[in-house]
From Swiss-Prot:
GO terms for molecular function: ATP binding; proton-transporting ATP synthase activity, rotational mechanism; proton-transporting ATPase activity, rotational mechanism. It comes from the Archaea. Component of the A-type ATP synthase that produces ATP from ADP in the presence of a proton gradient across the membrane. The A chain is the catalytic subunit. Its EC number is 7.1.2.2. Belongs to the ATPase alpha/beta chains family. Its main location: membrane. InterPro entries: ATP-synt_VA_C, ATP-synth_a_Xtn, ATP_synth_asu-like_sf, ATP_synth_asu_arc, ATPase_a/bsu_AS, ATPase_F1/V1/A1_a/bsu_N, ATPase_F1/V1/A1_a/bsu_N_sf, ATPase_F1/V1/A1_a/bsu_nucl-bd. This is A-type ATP synthase subunit A. It holds the Pfam family ATP-synt_VA_C.
Length: 586
């Protein structure tokens, strides 16, 4: 064990001498209080350490003790419903142990409880040959999730002993005979956060992640295993959009990272999720959620750790064959922490003071998303979707964090302050946003909704773009000076914006919209467009088309329950539309 001595302190960065024999990214205990830190640079016998706790009060001459291990997370039953800080310390346990609402410095509490006993049910039997990733048993961790206990990395052989019953995460549940001797298996594993968990290989992202948000699903779809960015200025709805994704996404587990944002946003999640039902299982949303809270008043160095801790936990659930959504709010705060530490290390700054390695760090994080074939002899498939919020100062998308993120991700949901000011939510700008997965996921949509889904979606997008072109003319000469056909286009584009793209996150029905309902809503609006054009071509007045009463039914369709809407209202609206538009023809 290496023991060194502090010679310099600069905010969260500490320099220690006498550290020969230490390794890069080794965890060390700093000062008399044993603050947790990580070695980020080594020079002969000097080590530069980023400390994950407040360094006020420590002084040169105090000791630094190496642990010989990299920053790792504990993986096993007990993570769901938990709330951790950036280095996986359980906040509830710390509060109970210290009777304080603040995290005392140097506190050390196990990430996963060592007291709770879990009912382990074996799947494998004595004599079975097992390899890394094989599931040997299960634990019913929450009402929603059956936790699969897997053979840890680097272990393969024959099961010599396996037992059912109630065990803590550190007790032996099985013994495997390997070439190197007997290995005891327990429910808990440890994994270094900076090392991606291995898999057999990545698969093509061809299945969409259904979020229940019409603008995201229909227009700018994200594939399962994909990565998306949500950049937007302050007050444009980034956090509410991420909360909606965490609530309604078609996944088994949600890992929500609050990285350098306000504490009240995490409080909102803690207060809301235990009362909301998961549409997939009917159980509470909190049963499938892991929260990592690294709020803006916590030490900046831990922001980087929180992002890596979150993605490692997500990969662990992925390896069980589950679908995982990881939301990071906000990656800009992580980048700002990198900039601060880079400045204290006196490194050459890059664009806007960010370090030159900003883009490679972002890429390392986003590239850990993916749909994979999991390790093990079974045919398990899992995926991790990453949705990262970006907070560009002043809404400037050309700043380094946003521009580097856009080079890596394939879905860009651009939040617009002007839309937010007009109370259009979600404030995703349909002219600047894009998805590069549309060609990959179109097959799923056509199979699960209707064959004309892609043509409807493309036509609706072109109408919205046409409206933007016509707006300049309208502002100069007014809508009445336009040809009849273009007046119809303006009316349909308005219906698309207000009746389809706008969605109320706080309405019990409109908060989530299924793929079938999304398709029928779009189909009705586009049918109105075609029939409106036919009516105008046959002599109808565009002003009359704008005044038909069926438009009120179309505006209300988002608030109808899916069964009632699809089975009853769709044919009614189509019939009413045909009769009212037909009556306008001279």
């Amino acid at each position: 064990m290496v023991v060194g001595k502090i010679i310099k302190i600069s905010g969260p960065v500490v320099v220690a001498e006498g550290m020969k024999g230490s390794q890069m990214f080794e965890v060390v205990k700093v000062g008399n209080e044993g603050l947790t830190g990580e070695i980020i640079q080594l020079t002969e016998d000097e080590a530069i350490i980023q400390v994950y706790e407040e360094t006020a009060g420590i002084k040169p001459g105090e000791g630094v003790t190496g642990t010989g291990a990299p920053l790792s997370v504990e993986l096993g039953p007990g993570m769901l419903k938990a709330m951790y800080d950036g280095i996986q310390r359980p906040l509830n346990e710390i509060e109970n142990a210290t009777d304080s609402i603040y995290i005392p410095r140097g506190v050390s509490v196990p990430s996963i409880s060592r007291e709770i006993k879990w009912d382990f049910e074996p799947i494998a039997a004595v004599g079975d040959e097992v390899i890394t990733g094989d599931v040997i048993g299960t634990v019913q961790e929450t009402a929603s999730i059956v936790h699969k206990i897997m053979i840890p990395f680097g272990v393969s052989g024959k099961i010599k002993e396996i037992k059912a019953g109630s065990f803590t995460v550190e007790e032996t549940i099985a013994v495997v005979e390997t070439a190197e001797g007997e290995k005891e298996i327990m429910m808990m594993q440890k994994w270094p956060v900076r090392k991606p968990r291995p898999s057999k290989g990545k698969q093509a992202p061809v299945i969409p992640l259904i979020t229940g948000q019409r603008v995201e699903d229909t227009f700018f779809g994200l594939a399962k295993g994909g990565a998306s960015a949500i950049p937007g200025p302050f007050g444009s709805g980034k956090t509410v959009t991420q909360h909606q994704l965490a609530k309604w996404s078609d996944v088994d587990v949600v890992v929500y990272i609050g990285c350098g944002e306000r504490g009240n946003e995490m409080t909102e999640v803690i207060e809301e999720f235990p009362h909301l039902d998961d549409i997939k299982t009917g159980n509470k949303l909190m049963d499938r959620t892991v929260l990592i809270a690294n709020t803006s008043n916590m030490p900046v160095a831990a922001r980087e750790a929180s992002v890596y801790t979150g993605i490692t936990i997500a990969e662990y659930f992925r390896d069980q064959g589950l679908g995982v959504l990881l939301t990071a709010d906000s990656t800009s705060r992580w980048a700002e922490a990198m900039r601060e530490i880079s400045g204290r290390l006196e490194e050459m700054p890059g664009e806007e003071g960010y370090p030159a390695y900003l883009s490679s760090k972002l890429a390392q994080f986003y590239e850990r998303a993916g749909r994979v074939e999991c390790l093990g002899s079974e045919n398990k498939q899992g995926f991790v979707c990453i949705v990262g919020a970006v907070s560009p100062p002043g809404g400037d998308f050309s700043e380094p964090v946003t521009s580097n993120t856009l080079r890596i991700v394939k879905v860009f949901w651009a939040l617009d302050a002007n839309l937010a000011r007009r109370r259009h939510f979600p404030a995703i700008n349909w002219l600047t946003s894009y998805s590069l997965y549309i060609d990959d996921i179109a097959g799923w949509w056509q199979q699960n909704t209707a064959a004309d889904w892609r043509s409807l979606r493309d036509e609706a997008m072109s109408l919205l773009q046409k409206e933007a072109e016509l707006q300049e003319i309208v502002q100069l000469v007014g809508p009445d000076a336009l040809p009849d056909r273009e007046r119809v286009i303006l009316e349909i584009a308005r219906m698309l914006r207000e009746d389809f793209l706008q969605q109320d996150a706080y309405h019990e029905v409109d908060s989530y919209c299924s793929p079938i309902k999304q398709y029928h809503m779009l189909k009705i609006i586009m049918t109105f467009y075609k029939k409106g054009l036919d009516a105008v071509a046959k002599g109808a007045d565009p002003a009359g088309i704008s005044a038909v009463t069926v438009k009120g039914d179309i505006a209300r369709m988002k608030y109808l329950v899916e069964d009632e809407f699809v089975n009853t209202k769709v044919p009614e609206i189509i019939n009413k539309m045909e009769s009212e538009l037909g009556a306008l023809i001279k």
